[in-house]
Amino acid sequence: MQTDKEKSLLRRLPWLQTLLASLVCILLGLLVGYIALLIINPAGANEAFLSIIKNFWSYSKPEKQLKNLGVTLVITAPLVMCSLSVLFAYKVGLFNIGAAGQYVAGAGACLYCALALKLPWIVCLLAAILAGALLGVISGAMKAYRNVNEVISCIMLNWIMLYLVNTVLATVKNPTGKDTYTLASRNPGAILPTVGLNDLFGQKNMTIAVPLAVVMCVVIWVFLSKTRLGYELRATGLNRNAARYCGMRDRFNMILTMGIAGGLAGMGAAFMFLSDFEQWAVTQASVPAMGFNGIAAAFLGGLNPIGAIFSSYFIQHISRGGGHLNMNMYSPQISDLILAVIIYMCGFVLFMKKFMNTQRGTGRKSRKGGRDQ
């Protein structure tokens, strides 16, 4: 009984450890951003900082607030999917830095199906998922059969997919610019259904992508926590040799994991581009940041599918908030600085949790030693 009483709140509630560690990362990022604002222009630092935090609340009219909230939610949905891709693989002991390339593959597949083949949205969505999954399977197979580090193979595939997609989508580029055609102008049937969300938020790009992203978070949580296959995948990640000894198909599990992770990232690309919110620039020379930001969102959310919803929204909220700064005094890149610090600190989330457990463990040993004396 005495041992139970000595258990700390932090040790009994692991989610609280994750929450506290994530909050520390967020607060440090906000602090650095505020200091940068003070250095640039102390007089307007407080107002500028509040503008970043408030984001759409900076508008006085409710309809403007709702519309800009819709924009934030639209760009949150693909980030949620990319963070799910990263955390799903991480739960199985793999670091899916290839979420960026899988996102690119999904973007290329859905846009080509929509603009070149004039297919309906459901087919374009499935094409994006399959393209991302295929890229993930390639990395998983290289890891399973040739023991090629997934980080190396994923990074190489990221760049291969970028230039491949640029080449393919050049066939559906608008001649007046560097971007692909809008779906509304060429194939409105490829746009995801809005089911009234566009009217509710006053934002035409508000589609089923947002609720679907939330549903996928719940599905992944249930799959990893409550199903036999999810248990096998996690067991393979914890100890591949032990899993094989227990009769689990370790190679198949690794390939399946990367395939599912790739499919999630590909779905994220479909959520972005099939909402017709953004077009693909066929001349871009760098991989879109969405996939890499998914890494930050995954760790900031404590590698929990439900936490990924809130961390992804926070990242996009701060990113959009930078657009409300007074451009004569500050650069909107201040919000990027805040996010950069938060992303950097995300690497310490697991370290902070381990530190909390170590400290509590040391404290109990000291008290036990005192009683023995």
Mark where each language-model region is:
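Cytosolic-side transmembrane-helix boundaries in multi-pass membrane proteins
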Residues: 1-26, 34, 39, 238, ...
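Membrane-interfacial amphipathic/re-entrant helices at transmembrane-helix boundaries
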Residues: 2-81
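Short loop segments and helix-boundary regions at transmembrane helix junctions
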Residues: 10-20, 90-97, 116-121, 125-187, ...
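Single transmembrane alpha-helix segments in multi-pass membrane proteins
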Residues: 37-41, 56-116, 129, 133-148, ...
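Transmembrane helix-bundle core of multi-pass membrane transporters
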Residues: 55, 150, 154, 158-226, ...
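Loop-to-transmembrane alpha-helix initiation sites
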Residues: 150-152, 178, 205-212, 254, ...
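Helix-loop-helix "hairpin" substructures at the membrane interface of multi-pass membrane proteins
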Residues: 201-280, 305-306
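Transmembrane alpha-helical segments in multi-pass inner-membrane proteins
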Residues: 259, 264-265, 269-340
